[in-house]
Amino acid sequence: MRFEDVAEILRVVGRAIALGCRDHYDAGQRAAVFASYASVLFVEALGPYEAVVAELEGRIVAYAQLDAATSRLRALFVDAECQGRGVGRALLADVEGRASRRGCARLHGAMSLNAVAFYARAGFRALGGEERLMSASEGVHISVVRMEKRLRA
């Protein structure tokens, strides 16, 4: 990811949240999640995390972020119009490979409710039930499921 990609990534994140999350989160929750990502994305683009994008026809359509130091998948968003076309699976496989090459034995994260089935199909397992996290924006609570996957060495 390049710093100049941030605006296009925000477009992808915004569409993924607005359309992909609407069956699991209300408008206020979706707005808080987007605001949280938007407020830190510029800083994170320059930070210690590894950001990866997927492109179709020269256009960014998906974004993921890996924190290899903690083996955490911090984000994975696919533009709503590209969901269900294998873009997310391909990007997740790329991130898993990067994590494995950096010595991560597992990959974990707090997964949104709309993405739990996606991660389960990819081999992740739930570490418990739903839990509520406070969004960094306006004190809104968001339900997530913590999941992890063991990676091949």
Where are these regions (language model features)?
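Conserved catalytic-core motifs of GNAT/GCN5-like acyltransferases
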Residues: 108-110, 125-146
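Acetyl-CoA-dependent GNAT
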Residues: 3-4, 11-81, 92-94, 98, ...
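Short secondary-structure boundary/hinge segments and terminal tails
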Residues: 100, 117, 136-138
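Short coil/turn motifs at beta-sheet boundaries
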Residues: 5, 102, 138-142
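Small/polar loops that bind or transfer phosphate-bearing groups
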Residues: 1, 110-111
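Flexible nucleotide-binding loop
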Residues: 85
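Conserved active-site tyrosine of GNAT-family acetyltransferases
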Residues: 119, 124
